[in-house]
A protein has these predicted regions:
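Extracytoplasmic "Venus flytrap"/periplasmic binding protein-like
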Residues: 85-158, 189-201, 298, 306, ...
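Glycine-centered hinge/linker elements that transmit conformational signals in sensory
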Residues: 210-212, 255-287
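C-terminal capping/gating helix-and-loop segments adjacent to ligand/active sites or protein-protein/ligand interfaces
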Residues: 99, 253-256, 341, 403-460
Length: 467
């Protein structure tokens, strides 16, 4: 298998850079000196340099009562925990938090950003079209004011939008509350029952474990697939794509590089492999009706040997399955090839017409630099908190699965084999492409080749609309 290292992969993950730096350096969080930032509404993706900072005061929340209007994603408690801690430290700031499923946010975000009461903070499923339409605040001024430009470069790149609408460079339109990693979680007791003594090193070894689980009367893989939550089979599919081929073309497609396609020979092998898993009965028979939160509850209650998910579930898994939860990176198809993983920031943005953009930006900076906020991210979310490279990583409880996910982040970071999520390629590709087509595959109404062609057609349709 060819080497997967490239400059493009640097866009996908800064985790190992920060982990290594955090392990080797010590420091204490400080709020960088800065100046006030302009908050004028952008009308389009900028083609010039960021506006020069003018006044000599740091953006903050002031001392007068403020209510931050926020939209969070259902099933992810840590953003709310961060909001509660922020109000504890800054009592003048209260929150009006609304939550919704990821797929609902995809459909609702344009209306929310353009409405009469646009959010100060909103979980962003995608951002290109919103940035181009002037619905999102350009954060370049805040980046200069708070010193974000001094943080590891790849940390911000996934949230940059260039004038031509491609991601990975250009102006900053979002910030990650943390930085995630995906892979395979497993129930240690059930894994022992099927003879698993160590994580599989190849796809063939993983296939053998799935077959053993099925033969033993166990559910091999717990996943979700409802239209409300979005089809979780996109997770194993993307891991299979990276097992069969390089990650660079996958990232090119996600970042909307000219000529990029998801319909490639290696991705066809991946989709065919997923179809075989479906036909073998490796997933719940009712997967198309299972919501994300229900799938996690069933997994922690002992239904399913394996589950594809991200490190944001670490805290919940440790609490529900203490000492019985493990994690490994999805193995490659070819022995000796490096494993790969999806990794992306938990992206939030500020509406262009938000009432309190300075306070929202101050919150972004606080999440990345405050010791308590960073600890909440690592302990409660299991994800890397980001921020300056010289800040120490918060302590991780002994025996926590977070130790395993952080170690895995170092592996794929060094190998350069990280990807953004295929669900993030366009504003609606998850809701209008992957979810319905994968649901059809589960129902026997779509095959591997048809899946990729249908999603590529939807992708091209959306690119025309967004540009």
């Amino acid at each position: 298998m060819s080497s997967r290292k490239s400059l493009g992969i640097a866009v996908a993950l800064f985790v190992v850079v920060s982990i290594v730096a955090s392990a080797c350096q010590a420091g204490t969080p400080t709020r960088a000196p800065a100046t006030a930032v302009p908050t004028a509404v952008p009308t389009a993706v900028p083609t010039a340099a960021p506006t020069e900072i003018q006044a000599p005061t740091i953006p903050n929340c002031g001392t007068e009562p403020i209510v931050l209007n926020a939209y969070f994603e259902t099933g992810f408690p840590v953003p709310k925990q961060l909001a509660e801690e922020f109000s504890r430290q800054f009592p003048n700031v209260k929150w009006d938090i609304k939550e919704d499923q990821f797929t609902n946010l995809i459909n609702a975000t344009p209306r929310l950003l353009s409405g009469d009461n646009p959010p100060d903070l909103i979980r962003l499923p995608t951002m290109v079209s919103f940035a181009k339409e002037g619905l999102l605040m350009n954060l370049d001024g805040y980046a200069a004011a708070f010193g974000w430009d001094q943080w590891p470069v790849p940390q911000l790149n996934q949230n940059r939008v260039a004038p031509d609408g491609t991601r990975g460079s250009g102006s900053l339109y979002g910030m990650g509350l943390n930085y995630s990693l995906t892979g395979v979680f497993y129930n240690k007791e059930l894994a022992a029952q099927i003879g698993m003594t160590e994580p599989p090193k190849t796809l063939a070894e993983f296939d053998e474990l799935l077959a053993r689980a099925k033969a033993a009367g166990l559910l091999p893989i717990m996943m979700w697939g409802s239209a409300k939550s979005g089809m979780g089979l996109a997770f194993p599919l993307q891991h299979l794509m990276a097992a069969y081929g390089p990650v660079e073309p996958i990232n090119d497609w996600i970042f909307q590089k000219p000529g990029a396609t998801i319909d490639t020979p290696s991705n066809l092998k991946a989709a065919q492999h997923l179809q075989k898993w479906i036909e073998n009965g490796y997933f719940p028979p009712d997967i198309n009706a299972i919501e994300y939160t229900d799938a996690n509850a069933r997994f922690t209650q002992g239904e399913g040997v394996f589950m594809f998910n991200g490190d944001w579930q670490n805290g919940a898994y440790d609490a529900a399955m203490p000492g019985n939860i493990g994690f490994f990176l999805f193995p490659p198809a070819e022995a000796g090839a490096p494993p790969a993983a999806m990794s992306a920031p938990l992206t939030f943005g500020i509406a262009a017409r938000a009432k309190h953009p300075d306070c929202a930006a101050f919150f972004f900076n606080w999440v990345a630099t405050d010791p308590t906020a960073r600890q909440i991210n690592v302990t409660g979310f299991g994800s890397h908190p980001g921020g300056p490279a010289d800040l120490p990583l918060p302590t991780v409880p002994p025996g926590s699965v977070t130790n395993e996910t952080l170690a895995a982040g170092a592996v794929v970071g060094k190998a350069g084999t990280t990807m953004d999520f295929i669900a993030n390629a366009t504003s609606s590709i998850f809701a209008q492409g992957w979810t319905p087509e994968l649901q059809k595959m589960v129902a026997g109404q779509q095959d591997a080749a048809g899946l990729l062609k249908a999603v590529q057609a939807e992708y091209e349709r959306e690119l025309v609309m967004e540009r």
